[in-house]
UniProtKB/Swiss-Prot annotation:
The organism of origin for this protein: Agrobacterium vitis (Rhizobium vitis)
Domain HTH lysR-type: 1-58
Protein purpose: Transcriptional regulator of the ttuABCDE tartrate utilization operon.
Keyword vocabulary terms for this entry: DNA-binding, Plasmid, Transcription, Transcription regulation
DNA-binding among keywords: yes
Molecular function in Gene Ontology: DNA binding; DNA-binding transcription factor activity
DNA-binding region per Swiss-Prot/TrEMBL record: 18-37
InterPro entries in alphabetical order: LysR_subst-bd, Tscrpt_reg_HTH_LysR, WH-like_DNA-bd_sf, WH_DNA-bd_sf
GO cellular component terms attached to this protein's record: protein-DNA complex
Name of the protein: HTH-type transcriptional regulator TtuA
Disulfide bonds listed in the record: none
Family indicated by similarity: Belongs to the LysR transcriptional regulatory family.
């Protein structure tokens, strides 16, 4: 017994005429008769008494009609339910990003991705690299933008994107605030606000190594973890801070951002940004955004 056979049976029962029922279903009368005959054979009983002039349901036909209507109605409800669910289901790409990428790269990238793939929604989580990597490994994220550590878990695929330029954040009242640029030597003996190495190793090491390369000792006045906190401390004239260029978008009152000039050999005045995802996981949405990113990487890097 098949659903199509039941639909044919109910249609004939409603019309009590094979020709009209066949027309209603879009079938040839001979094809409709064959479906009814196959249904009767599968049930082992006559469902209709047919003459050249009339069609009537047998007792078994009347019994089946009630159940057939219920089956078809339930089937339609289920089909509609899953069709609606399928239409409403939106693919979600879960993206994690360090604060630098969340404020710098991601707004432009996500805008471009939405233009290209409007049917895919994105969910953005901002965190530090040390917490984003475990989320990738556990399947909690599909893609992350991180500062790749020296040792990367072999289960992860990482792709270097570009370096983010570092600038010096200082109080607008500082003696160097109106300079167009400064060097590390200009910052000698200046109190510095530095991120903790445990949570931000790349940013911490950047400051320290720049001073070491210049033959100077960094004078750390304050350790802080969050970029917003660091910039607020700069505004309070606690010290200066070497931060990614995007930090200027925080627009904290009383803070100026000055270009940091370094010698050619000092390539460490930039912070590396990488994309990472779990190897061996098929994810078309992730692949689409990575492809878009790689195709426009030079454009995105210009503003880094």
């Amino acid at each position: 017994m098949e659903l199509n056979q039941l639909r044919c049976f109910v249609s004939v029962a409603d019309e009590l005429h094979f020709g009209r029922a066949a027309q209603k279903l879009g079938l040839m009368p001979a094809s409709l008769s064959r479906h009814i005959r196959m249904l009767e054979e599968s049930l082992g009983t006559r469902l209709m008494a047919r003459t050249t002039r009339s069609v009537a349901l047998t007792d078994d036909g009347l019994f089946l009609l009630e159940g057939a209507r219920e089956i078809l109605e339930r089937t339609e409800v289920l089909q509609n339910r899953f069709q609606t669910s399928r239409q409403e289901r939106v693919e979600i790409l879960r993206i994690g990003a360090i604060d630098s990428a969340a404020a710098g790269l991601l707004p432009t990238l996500l805008h471009d991705f939405r233009q290209q793939c409007p049917e895919i929604s994105t969910q953005l989580s901002e965190d530090k690299t040390i917490r984003l990597i475990p989320k990738l490994l556990s399947g909690g994220l599909d893609l992350a933008f991180i500062r790749a550590p020296d040792f990367v878990d072999p289960k992860l695929k990482t792709v270097f994107l570009f370096h983010e330029t570092a600038v010096v954040a200082m109080s607008e009242n500082h003696r160097l605030a109106h300079n167009t640029s400064v060097t590390i030597h200009d910052l000698a003996d200046e109190p510095l606000i530095v991120p903790e190495r445990r949570s931000r190793p790349h940013s911490h090491d950047l400051t320290m190594k720049l001073f070491i390369e210049a033959g100077l000792q960094a004078r750390v006045a304050q350790l802080a973890e969050e970029k917003q906190t660091i910039v607020n401390l700069v505004a309070a004239e606690i010290g200066l801070a070497i931060v990614p260029q995007w930090t200027a978008r925080l627009a904290v009152s009383g803070v100026r951002y000055v270009t940091l000039q370094t010698d050619a050999k000092e390539a460490m005045n930039k912070l590396p940004l990488s994309a990472a995802w779990l190897k061996g996981v098929r994810d078309p949405a992730r692949d689409l955004i990575v492809s878009l990113l790689q195709s426009r990487i030079s454009q995105y890097a210009e503003n880094a």
